[in-house]
Amino acid sequence: MSFIITIAVIVVIVLFVISVYNSLVRARMQTQEAWSQIDVQLKRRNDLLPNLIETVKGYGKYEQATLEKVTQLRAQVASASSPADAMKASDALTRQISGIFAVAESYPDLKANENYLKLQEELTNTENKISYSRQLYNSVAGNYNVKLQAFPSNVIAGMFAFRPADFLSTPEEEKAVPKVDFGSNGLGE
């Protein structure tokens, strides 16, 4: 009788370990899937950028440095070895793209260019998707990391060498409150 109880306890423990292990694997896979959604949007943006660069190229020689920086950052995003590196390059690229859009305000012909307007809309939509995907990734990564730290799954995670997922943080430049100057009387007059 005690032999059957011992076997039953061992079976319950093994089933519990399998259940927790599978739960951790699912959470890790969801984190990887969430990252792949970001990666898809980064690739989409990288595919749109050559068209934007070609469209903007003829509208000002002093912006050439900005276009070269965009090309360089685009390559960094594509060749990043980790999600954190990809997002660091991506954040810098986002700032450069915003700079291109700001400079375009000085060129009425460019602002009226239908191809430019389409690209601007596509890139804006893609940036919004990247932002949403980052939020989703951080949420899923947070859930996964909680499972890694909560008892008893932390014991199983340690036994099978599960590693926590990195969060994607917002760069300090983007957290800063923008300075707005409407002139001396506050109305731009």
Swiss-Prot record:
InterPro entries: LemA-like_dom_sf, MamQ_LemA. The chain crosses the membrane at residues 1-21. SUPFAM superfamilies: LemA-like. GO terms for cellular component: plasma membrane. Induction: Expression is maximal during the early to mid-log stage of growth and decreases after. Does not respond to heat shock up to 43 degrees Celsius. Part of the lemA-htpX operon. Its main location: membrane. It is found in: Cell membrane. Keywords: Cell membrane, Coiled coil, Membrane, Transmembrane, Transmembrane helix. It comes from the Bacteria. It is a single-pass membrane protein. Disruption phenotype: No effect on extracellular glucosyltransferase activity, nor on growth characteristics. Residues 110-138 form a coiled coil. Belongs to the LemA family. This is Protein LemA. The gene is lemA.
